Amino acid sequence: MKKRIPKIIGVVGFSLIILVVGIFAYLYFNHAIIISEGKEFKNQGSPIIKSQLSKDEVKEDIDYIIDIMENTHPIFLEDVPESYYIAKNELLTASNQGVTVGELQYKVSRYLSSINDGHTALWWEENMFLDIDWKYLDGNLYLLDSNKKLTDKVVTKIGDIEIGKIIESIRAHFPAENYVAEAKNIERFLKGKLVLENVGVDCAKDILVTLSNGEEDKILEVEFISGSEYRSVNNGIYSKVIDKNIAYIRLGTCEINSTLKSVIENIEKYKSEGIKDYIIDVIDNPGGDSNACSMLLEALNMKGGAYGGMLRFSPLAQDQRGYLRKSGHIEYKSNNNAVKNNDINLYILTNENTFSSAQMLAVWVSDGNLGKIVGRPSSNMPSNYGDVLKFQMKNSKLIGQISHKKFIRPDIGKDKEQILEPDIYVEYGDDILERAIDYINK
């Protein structure tokens, strides 16, 4: 018996080792094991657009961005579009000569845009914009009046260049996941001096914009102004009761903080008071932490389905996220096991600027039939790439971001849809909140 004890201990010990190794292997190949907090991205300096780069500096930056792209983005584990290889060859050709930082920015932007991922792009450096407001609808660029309302005047030329030529250049150089994103790009980048110069507009003099109402042309003289082209938006988080019986929740950004927790406390109060109609407003919400959206649904005694997808490990992801692995990938399965609260009527307000995690909230509600979407569709596809990592090119100092995850919506039968269409569509210029209130009170 005594002779058998060491043998038994050995067998048990070996079995435990096999078990531990098996558990570790399972976790290693099926879960994102995080072993550190990851390093915070540090800006190594600002790009100087007019600065000249040597041939060697250009080549080094181009080699770097191609390496980052192909070793980080999940699309390279799937079917890569032919447009990517065309753009890559064009970029490699550009590495044979010196260019300015601005010229390199344009070429790299075209390269990154070839996969049409709205999360993967350069942080576009531009500080001069036409002092004009317009809206791209149904294939036309309409002038807006001082109150941001549509006019009947359509932009047909900027300088001597036909508007169609400029739009084609924007389509080629900036990522768009759907027609909404394309319209946003046109509205934004058509104002930029660098973009206009690239297509041949003479920006050394006052810019003449040709307008047409279908009967006659009119010339409008427009100046460039410096500063951001972005309008200010309300990114607050708060709640209130409107019309005595509707709980309005403004989620201006997807962030878990004290104000969100106060809103959740208010929701409990609203429920105890018998309020049945709830509006969550994510208009112009750029995204953030999707858990903030989950917390709001949970407070309403609801639960969305689960996004599936893929996480790709890479040196960049390991550095910034603290993953154990720096290569390979793991996959997750979607499910649409949503939980609806039939005692509550839920309405999600969205527009073209509802993005990333905020768009996920709308998809959860739509796929799980938890409520109604009111407004206009997002520039973000319901299934998309995301969870961005930052990068900076050594010589040009250009900064950008790249997705390292793919997200597949809960209802996989709708995976290929490019747009999440609202249940109640609200035309541009009409108030989305007012439309939702009218629908509730009808």
Residue ranges of each PLM-predicted region?
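Flexible, low-complexity junctional segments that flank or bridge functional domains
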Residues: K2-Y278, D284-P286, M302, A306, ...
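C-terminal "post-core" interaction segments
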Residues: N30-G45, I49-D63, I237-K442
